[in-house]
Amino acid sequence: MRLFLSLPVLVVVLAMVWEGPAPTQAAPEISSTLGRIPDKLKEFGNTLEDKARAAIDSIKQSDIPAKTRNWFSETFNKVKEQLKTAFS
């Protein structure tokens, strides 16, 4: 039974090996790849900067920071009052 299963798998693997790499999978030259690295890094940095600025701007324009700050200050004051009454 194992032989019946392994033979077709072996045939498929050998066919893939004999076919070779597809044209899109061919390895590009190392010098051209290394030459494009600075451009890719700059593009990545610009994209990251734009996304970070957009996120920060949306946070600044929303009222979430003010609500969060108010909630923390109210909660802190409540805890402080409870501790003051508990230890007085």
Swiss-Prot record:
Q: Does the keyword Secreted apply?
A: yes
- Cross-referenced PANTHER family, in alphabetical order? APOLIPOPROTEIN C-I (PTHR16565:SF2)
Query: What GO molecular functions are on record for this protein?
Result: fatty acid binding; phospholipase inhibitor activity
Task: Write the protein's name.
Answer: Apolipoprotein C-I
One GO term under biological process is: triglyceride metabolic process
List the Gene3D superfamilies hit by this protein, alphabetically.
Answer: Apolipoprotein C-I
What the entry lists under Pfam families is as follows: ApoC-I
Chief location bin: secreted
Species of the source: Neomonachus schauinslandi (Hawaiian monk seal)
Question: Which residue positions does the secretion signal occupy?
Answer: 1-26
- Please describe what this protein does: Inhibitor of lipoprotein binding to the low density lipoprotein (LDL) receptor, LDL receptor-related protein, and very low density lipoprotein (VLDL) receptor. Associates with high density lipoproteins (HDL) and the triacylglycerol-rich lipoproteins in the plasma and makes up about 10% of the protein of the VLDL and 2% of that of HDL. Appears to interfere directly with fatty acid uptake and is also the major plasma inhibitor of cholesteryl ester transfer protein (CETP). Binds free fatty acids and reduces their intracellular esterification.
* Alphabetized InterPro entries for the sequence: ApoC-1_sf, ApoC-I
One GO CC term on file: high-density lipoprotein particle
User: Which superkingdom, per the lineage?
Assistant: Eukaryota
Q: Which family does it belong to?
A: Belongs to the apolipoprotein C1 family.
Location in the cell reads: Secreted
Q: Recite the UniProt keywords alphabetically.
A: Lipid transport, Secreted, Signal, Transport, VLDL
